[in-house]
């Protein structure tokens, strides 16, 4: 069995996340695909996730991909959180997400005053209403009332500002975000927005998702996969990896069991430690994927500086694949203030590299840099 140290894992995973060197300009969709989508609860963070990995990223590239080229799609996905997914891969994600039991638990819907039967009726009406249309929540509620004849169901949709009631439609491939009008969010149906090819079977889709997760976030455990996916629990994760058979292999990471793609075993074993400094934004995919074993990539007792209350994940100063500090940025007129707070004294070379990244960020955001180091 292959035995790895966390130093090797950090280097290997950084390479898989394109954090050792940036991808060429124009690689935005390839990076989004490799990361299994971009976490987009905060859209600006999704943009900076790409900035940290793609050379010469255009500041407006994500907006154009979403609303003009329609090559990225914003929808609810893993863990019920907002993601940007490559449009060409939506059939895969919808097929896998449709197996999730996350929103099939009656207790969730009792809080909304809905039964599962009423939820299914509402979800079906949403799918019909959005076919070929782009609607605000209010317009969607009105159309749902027309289709169902139920003012009560329409009211449930209109009165809730939360996305929970819309997520079953998103998981089954019947809803995604359309372009907003001012501050008003709008929704549409993926098959009419981007065109949907035939979905793979649920079994094939879940196996592919598990394989792609390990390719980007491995070596990983059943628990890592279960947390990242957000449904099905440990039993579901075990079932998914078992489906891969010989495509995955057991490894030990500093004595702890994990799994890796079999084709990656030799590459990971022989991979050299990297020299790389990056400013990762809030909710970066690298940090999200490490949430269960972050203590191996962080100094002792500093987990709560990165993984904060209410699910907030701080921007991270990443050094050679390890989390060595946090940072933030603020716009102040025509200046960008970047505040770097390393967890300990950093070597001069790391300091220079971090300053270069901050300068690169200021250029990307079209501001002059004001850099502040704090203990």
Features from the language model and the residues they span:
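A short, conserved structural fragment
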Residues: 67-77, 81-82, 171-180, 245-253, ...
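Short, cationic-aromatic polyanion-contact patches
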Residues: 84-90, 181-200, 257-270
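A short acidic, leucine-rich amphipathic alpha-helix
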Residues: 65, 137-145, 169, 222-227, ...
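Active-site-proximal binding-pocket segments
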Residues: 207-264
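Non-catalytic regulatory appendages
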Residues: 243, 247-302
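Positively charged, polyanion-binding regions of nucleic-acid-associated proteins
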Residues: 115-134, 202-220, 239-240
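Phosphate-backbone binding and catalysis cores of DNA-processing enzymes
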Residues: 1-152, 300, 337
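Glycine-rich, small/acidic residue-mixed loop/short-helix segments
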Residues: 306-375
């Amino acid at each position: 069995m292959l035995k790895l140290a966390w130093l090797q894992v950090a280097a290997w995973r950084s390479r898989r996340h394109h954090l050792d060197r940036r991808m060429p300009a124009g690689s935005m969709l390839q990076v989004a695909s490799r990361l299994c989508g971009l976490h987009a609860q905060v859209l600006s963070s999704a943009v900076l996730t790409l900035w940290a990995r793609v050379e010469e990223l255009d500041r407006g590239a994500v907006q154009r991909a979403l609303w003009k080229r329609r090559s990225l799609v914003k929808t609810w996905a893993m863990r019920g959180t907002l993601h940007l997914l490559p449009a060409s891969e939506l059939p895969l994600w919808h097929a896998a997400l449709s197996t999730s039991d996350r929103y099939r638990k009656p207790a969730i819907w009792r809080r909304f005053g809905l039964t599962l039967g009423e939820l299914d009726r509402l979800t079906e009406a949403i799918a019909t209403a959005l076919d070929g249309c782009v609607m605000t929540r209010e317009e969607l509620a009105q159309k749902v009332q027309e289709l169902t004849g139920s003012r009560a169901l329409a009211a449930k949709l209109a009165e809730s500002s939360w996305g929970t009631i819309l997520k079953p439609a998103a998981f089954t491939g019947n809803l995604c975000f359309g372009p907003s009008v001012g501050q008003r969010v709008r929704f549409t149906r993926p098959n009419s927005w981007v065109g949907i090819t035939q979905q793979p079977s649920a079994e094939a889709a879940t196996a592919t998702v598990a394989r792609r997760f390990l390719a980007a976030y491995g070596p990983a455990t059943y628990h890592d996969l279960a947390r990242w996916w957000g449904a099905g629990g440990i039993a579901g994760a075990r079932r998914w990896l078992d489906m891969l058979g010989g495509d995955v292999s057991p490894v030990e990471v500093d004595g702890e069991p994990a799994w890796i793609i079999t084709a990656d075993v030799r590459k990971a074993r022989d991979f050299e430690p990297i020299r790389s400094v990056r400013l990762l934004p809030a909710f970066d995919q690298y940090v999200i994927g490490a949430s269960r074993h972050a203590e191996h990539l962080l100094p002792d007792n500093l987990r709560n500086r990165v993984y904060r209350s209410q699910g907030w994940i701080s921007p991270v100063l990443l050094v050679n694949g390890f989390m060595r500090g946090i940072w933030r940025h603020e716009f102040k007129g025509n200046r960008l203030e970047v505040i770097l707070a390393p967890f300990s004294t950093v070597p001069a070379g790391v300091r220079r590299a971090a300053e270069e990244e901050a300068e690169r960020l200021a250029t990307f955001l079209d501001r002059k840099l004001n850099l502040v180091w704090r203990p």
